[in-house]
């Protein structure tokens, strides 16, 4: 009886130690690489929009705005935004591990001496 209590306590302590989150290796390196890539995409987008938006502003200021001269500029702007969105979507798909922790846990569920089925899997009608 005492042995079973000691084993239970030892396994519980082991389970608690395993449940403590451990930081992933080289967090900072992953974060810097991801930030550099995102910054590169945003700088490219800014460079493209810095050439398109002044043209749109000049058309608006001159009062010479019509579909024929504005549509190509909006198409260029839309293309730049779609390209940036696609580039940023790749980062989302890869996932960033920076700043996150991985948890490992061991769930200890007490079992009855009459059955080897864990309590969480017993049907509601099963008595203890």
Swiss-Prot record:
Question: In the record, which residues are listed under signal peptide?
Answer: 1-19
Question: What keywords are annotated for this sequence in UniProt?
Answer: Signal
Q: What triggers production of this protein? A: Expression is negatively regulated by the basidioma development repressor lfc1. Expression is positively regulated by the cross-pathway control WD-repeat protein 2 (CPC2) during fruiting body development.
Superkingdom per UniProt: Eukaryota
Question: What is known about what this protein does?
Answer: Plays a role in the regulation of fruiting body development.
Would you tell me the protein name for this molecule? Fruiting body differentiation protein 16
Q: Which organism is it from?
A: Flammulina velutipes
Record lineage:
Eukaryota, Fungi, Dikarya, Basidiomycota, Agaricomycotina
Q: Which gene encodes it?
A: FVFD16
């Amino acid at each position: 009886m005492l042995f079973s209590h000691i084993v239970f306590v030892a396994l519980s302590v082991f389970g608690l130690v395993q449940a403590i989150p451990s930081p992933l290796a080289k967090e900072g390196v992953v974060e810097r690489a991801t930030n550099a890539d995102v910054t590169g995409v945003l700088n490219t987008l800014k460079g493209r929009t810095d050439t398109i938006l002044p043209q749109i502003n000049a058309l608006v200021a001159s009062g010479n705005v019509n579909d024929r001269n504005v549509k190509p500029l909006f198409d260029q702007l839309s293309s730049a935004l779609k390209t940036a969105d696609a580039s940023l979507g790749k980062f989302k798909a890869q996932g960033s591990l920076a700043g996150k922790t991985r948890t490992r846990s061991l769930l200890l569920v007490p079992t009855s001496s009459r059955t080897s089925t864990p309590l969480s899997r017993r049907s509601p009608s099963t008595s203890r």
